């Protein structure tokens, strides 16, 4: 899943793909490098200037429409928590709604069902979108995340979303500190055991940077390490900034698993 941001203030690319032409060029590169999904975003995850639903639609709908025309067989995802945005991008040709904010707008699942879209059900610690808690605390982060995302998946099914179109995401760093995100990485197999496909969106995240003591532009290798561990433990989808590197890392993990190597359990 390749990240294609139409945001002027993205934490990683700082607006490099904000203009429509630049976003399309980034999508072309991602497809050439082997992306299976293009994930379009119009609002950065962190705090910042207010972005209304109308402005988010202005940013993402034309890009979705252009990508659908250019790549008829590509899976197009939109990173949004808003039902109104999902409605618009569904009409433009989107296939998947990537809700990183844990069902902040419950109506989103009904929109996904009405348009036969896929839906990512994530755990955001009950946060209001685009906010960060002070000193997040979880007595049992795995148990809380697993319980929440499976309940969200069940609610999506009840709303009419097809079960084979539901994905779960532990949402590293969303309402979680570095220890929590590392623990979820270590315990990916427990999330995969729920039976729902697991999405990992850890590329260049703060927990990687804090673990290594590195800034946002220096986290590529650490991000690949997280990707490899999560892939080994059963994650199925990976939201990344560098498609080529991710595909190569995943190819090695796949080869190792196919040759019979197994992790040691104690």
Q: What do the PLM-derived regions correspond to, one by one?
A:
Residues 28-32, 152-165:
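Phosphate/pyrophosphate-binding loops at sites that engage ATP/ADP/AMP, CoA/4′-phosphopantetheine
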Residues 25-41:
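Catalytic domains of carbohydrate-active enzymes, especially glycoside hydrolases
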Residues 1, 35, 75, 95, ...:
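Hydrophobic "anchor" residues on beta-strands that sit immediately upstream
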Residues 8-26, 45-69, 75, 80-84, ...:
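Active-site-adjacent loop and "lid" segments of alpha/beta metabolic enzymes
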């Amino acid at each position: 899943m390749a990240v294609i941001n139409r945001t002027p203030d993205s934490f990683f690319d700082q607006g490099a793909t904000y203009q429509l032409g630049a976003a399309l060029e980034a999508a072309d590169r991602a497809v050439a490098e082997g992306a299976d999904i293009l994930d379009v975003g119009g609002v950065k995850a962190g705090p910042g200037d207010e972005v209304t639903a109308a402005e988010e639609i202005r940013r993402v709908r034309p890009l979705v429409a252009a990508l659908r025309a250019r790549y008829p067989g590509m899976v197009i995802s939109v990173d949004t928590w808003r039902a109104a945005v999902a409605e618009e991008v569904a009409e433009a040709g989107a296939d998947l709604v990537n809700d990183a904010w844990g069902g902040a707008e419950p109506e989103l699942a009904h929109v996904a069902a009405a348009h036969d879209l896929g839906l990512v059900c994530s755990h955001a610690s009950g946060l209001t979108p685009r906010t960060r808690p002070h000193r997040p605390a979880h007595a049992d982060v795995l148990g809380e995340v697993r319980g929440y995302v499976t309940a969200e998946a069940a609610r999506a099914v009840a709303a009419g979303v097809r079960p084979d179109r539901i994905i779960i995401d532990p949402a590293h760093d969303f309402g979680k500190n570095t220890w929590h995100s590392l623990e979820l990485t270590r315990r990916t197999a427990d999330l995969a055991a729920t039976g729902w496909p697991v999405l990992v969106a850890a590329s260049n995240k703060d927990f990687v940077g804090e673990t290594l003591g590195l800034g946002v532009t220096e986290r590529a290798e650490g991000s690949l390490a997280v990707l490899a561990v999560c892939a080994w433990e059963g994650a199925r989808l990976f939201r990344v900034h560098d498609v080529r590197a991710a595909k190569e890392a995943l190819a090695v993990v796949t080869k190792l698993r196919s040759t019979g190597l197994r992790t040691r359990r104690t």
